[in-house]
Amino acid sequence: MHIVVVGLSHRTAPVEVREKLSIPDQSITKSLKALKAFSEVLEVSILSTCNRLEIYALVKDKNTGISSIKEFISDYSGIIFEDLNPHLFCFRQEDAVLHLMKVSAGLDSLVLGEGQILSQVKKMMRLGQENQSTGPILNRLLTQSVSTGKKVRSETNLGTGAVSISSAAVELAQLKIGQEKGFDTLVSLESEKVLVVGAGRMSRLLITHLKAKGCHKLILVNRNIDRALNLAIDFPDIEIVCKGLNELDENISISSLVFTSTASEEPIIDLAKIEKLNLNNKLKFIDIGVPRNISNDVKNHQFVKSFDVDDLQEVVSRNQEFRQKIAKEAESLVEEERIIFLEWWASLEAVPVINKLRSDLELIRKEELQKALSRMGPDFSARERKVVEALTKGIINKILHTPVTKLRSPQSREERQASLKIVEKLFSLVDEDKNS
């Protein structure tokens, strides 16, 4: 069996490719079933975020398993394999384990150390378990990866003051507005007419950071206006005017800065819509939705500047130098956790031999106990029988304790295999004809 991961991320694919591979929560169950339908795939889990799609699997054969996963990704995205493959990465065994732990720790994020990825890995684990697509191996790996993410954040300063996608989006707005004014600094957003489209978690974070950067008033547009109103209640210090999606156009026309973060799988704003507004003022769009909420053709409008998640790199790179130093410490913790998992996984090789040995000894125990009890006669009470039974079980457990502990202990694969062969030979656990 082999652990593999196949996927793509902000490091390997631009947003126009990533958005075609975004798997929304409501499609996870169907996707997991499709992956489990491949005979090579034993366990599988999907991590889908705005910056990555990664499929982790336990497969019988690594090459066939990886090919099956790539086939699924190509079919799902509608991108022919030849165009898709250059954007895909594959990690196997130890490298796959290390990658997931680094992802969970925020070490592979666009925004180094960001915290949201940890909750996304938790969700991946939960969805895999709910759909019964994961088993003992991936469940153990996912659980330990989540623990690793928590450990990195509690034992290092990587998560301290870490920026998120939302905060980077707000900083990008500050930077671009400042550059228009001749500054290379982050300016206040106090004078901007701000519109936020969407009322989910990312929009909540956007409003939090907008408030911190000088915004005291904004318009919040959402398809479900009740959800927008509920979000606005949590920000009593900001004047938030809530509107339905049917009022989006008129509110774009009176705004200078628009943030979009909705779950729409198709753009909700395109050039045709903007041209109908007859804009005569400069307008900036910052779209952190994946799939994108704003069509790429909007950039062709003379008064519009549009940015997406890939443009956040300009802001992120300004903050990364300090975090890179802390990341070294975090990487050493991740490596420790990787070794712990691999030692546990390697020890599973001994389980069939241990189970066979225990089963054979249990059979002997029962046979010999039955012989002894049959000689004790009717005067031997039920209580005494229970005592003798417990005694024989205790003896077997004591005999097994040391060899089982040794077989499961950390050691090289060669050492463990040699020990297993000795045990199999000494206790006749294998058919000699099959071994010859």
Curated annotation (Swiss-Prot):
The record marks H99 as: Important for activity. It catalyses: (S)-4-amino-5-oxopentanoate + tRNA(Glu) + NADP(+) = L-glutamyl-tRNA(Glu) + NADPH + H(+). GO terms for biological process: chlorophyll biosynthetic process; protoporphyrinogen IX biosynthetic process. Pathway: Porphyrin-containing compound metabolism; protoporphyrin-IX biosynthesis; 5-aminolevulinate from L-glutamyl-tRNA(Glu): step 1/2; Porphyrin-containing compound metabolism; chlorophyll biosynthesis. Its EC number is 1.2.1.70. Keywords: Chlorophyll biosynthesis, NADP, Oxidoreductase, Porphyrin biosynthesis. Substrate binds at T49, C50, N51, R52, S109, E114, G115, Q116, Q120. It is an enzyme of class 1 (oxidoreductase). GO terms for molecular function: glutamyl-tRNA reductase activity; NADP binding. The active site is at C50 (nucleophile). NADP(+) binds at G198, A199, G200, R201, M202, S203. Belongs to the glutamyl-tRNA reductase family. Homodimer. During catalysis, the active site Cys acts as a nucleophile attacking the alpha-carbonyl group of tRNA-bound glutamate with the formation of a thioester intermediate between enzyme and glutamate, and the concomitant release of tRNA(Glu). The thioester intermediate is finally reduced by direct hydride transfer from NADPH, to form the product GSA. Catalyzes the NADPH-dependent reduction of glutamyl-tRNA(Glu) to glutamate 1-semialdehyde (GSA). Possesses an unusual extended V-shaped dimeric structure with each monomer consisting of three distinct domains arranged along a curved 'spinal' alpha-helix. The N-terminal catalytic domain specifically recognizes the glutamate moiety of the substrate. The second domain is the NADPH-binding domain, and the third C-terminal domain is responsible for dimerization. This is Glutamyl-tRNA reductase. It comes from Prochlorococcus marinus (strain MIT 9312). The gene is hemA.
